[in-house]
Amino acid sequence: GIDFSKFASYKTAIGTVDGKNYNVPFDSGVTALFIRTDVIGEAGYSIDDFTDITWSKFIELGEDVLAKTGKPLLSAQAGGPDLLIAILRSAGDSMFDEDGNPNFAGNDVVAEAVEDYETMVDKGILVEVNDWDQYIGTINNGTVASVINGCWITSTIQAQEDQSGDWGVTTMPRLDNAPNATNYSNNGGAGWMVMNDSPNKALAIDFLMNTFASSTELYDTI
């Protein structure tokens, strides 16, 4: 069998129903602030200035970086929930309650997150784009000086070889007033499932048991 205790509990919980696990966790979506150290350096800052800070401080720094370099700190897909979800999760909150119902009315954490987002847009610190390709473009072409997303975004950053050595990574900002605010969050991460009517069900289960469910060497390699 598979020893699910070897995985982070939040990864196994999402695939567990009535005490039975239905998936093998794959990657995590640990969220961080990836930032162009060359750009913030031009504005007189280092990565330490952006470490373990609040969103109000991030906005303050963002205004100064924009004024001195002409570069906004962030971009986001207009209407996309990724950044807001990451902010809410950093404070242990969500857009939905445990029953899947909207969790907006009377939710001070949601209100604060939305207010910070709107402030960044209004001040030009965050640039909204139309689609995912444009979002990736703002990172690769140097339109923005940082990105807040799951750790899987590193493949996008590393693909731009001419920016090698220009990026650093640190904690994301935290909400100023939320009681459970932290500088840590998660966005994304996947899992593997075998369909019950798969013609190669036994083979697929055996494959998962001997690869993603047990081999730390495989994870280190990929």
Region locations from a protein language model:
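Short glycine- and hydrophobic/aromatic-rich loop-to-beta-strand nucleating segment
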Residues: 31-35, 88, 192-194
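Short helix-initiation/N-cap motifs at beta->coil->alpha
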Residues: 52-59, 127-141
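Extracytoplasmic/periplasmic substrate-recognition and gating elements
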Residues: 43, 123-125, 160-222
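Glycine-centered hinge/linker elements that transmit conformational signals in sensory
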Residues: 59-64, 100-129, 172
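Alpha-to-beta junction loops
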Residues: 70-71, 141-150
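Hinge/lid segment of periplasmic solute-binding proteins
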Residues: 1-32, 59, 168-172
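Extracytoplasmic "Venus flytrap"/periplasmic binding protein-like
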Residues: 1-7, 41-44, 143-146, 160-162, ...
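Beta->alpha turn/N-cap motifs
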Residues: 80, 132, 149-154, 188-190
